[in-house]
Amino acid sequence: DGLVVDSFFSGAQVSFGNKLKATLEAGRWDLSNANKGIGATTDKAANYQGIELGYAAGNLSVGASYRQFSSDAFKVANRYNTSGELEDKATIWSVGGKYRFDKNLALAGAYAQNTKADELKKSGSVELDYKGTKNSDMGSWGAYLAYRHVGTNVSLAPTYSTDHAGGNVTVYGTKGFDLGIGYVPFKNVLTQVQYFRGKELVTDDKVQTLYGRVSFFF
């Protein structure tokens, strides 16, 4: 669900399978897309290899992935090497799933961990979704309520608009509640309002974000 990386890479991707689907990836990832805690001052891109497995049956979908990034940027990343040894790799595994109770209500969860980082190496998300927007359907709407824990040394470029790490506000990451509503007032026009309230990891400082966006689709 974008807990680890929601970003394109330069390279190759191969997918195969039906109900059980596998995706193999390899290439280079632009570190300018990484969060503020990782940065890209010592290296412009990371070597990347990954594998994803996904399975869907009825109302249930589950998945797991393994990703490896190699770059000198991890040697100087914030709280990445507190043990004293300079590690230049990120080895990240993640699992997730979603269950749809009916056409309107769904519960999703995801967890990820970087086994090479010393700190800020775990992330997790639990989200309850109600309905959902469809850009071609004027008047459609959806809402979600989530609790997220986003560590910057594992969530390198998360998809969430309100997590502060993705917005380069914090080098540590955050934990807290995230609420969002989407509405389609006109065909191919999506409006979104999101609110996050929680604390910054490490410092425990209170953080909150109110985020709004209007998107046009052609």
Each language-model region and where it sits:
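Outer-membrane beta-barrel channel domains
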Residues: 1-25, 210
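Extracytoplasmic/secreted cell-surface and envelope-processing proteins
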Residues: 2-3, 31-35, 47, 72-73, ...
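Fold-independent oxyanion-binding glycine-rich loops
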Residues: 25-28, 65-67
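Phosphate/diphosphate-binding glycine-rich loops and adjacent basic-rich segments that engage nucleotide
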Residues: 34-52, 65-66
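Charged helix-capping and loop-helix junction motifs
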Residues: 7-9, 46-48, 124-127
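Conserved positions at the start
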Residues: 9-11, 50, 178
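Outer-membrane beta-barrel pore domains
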Residues: 41, 54-218
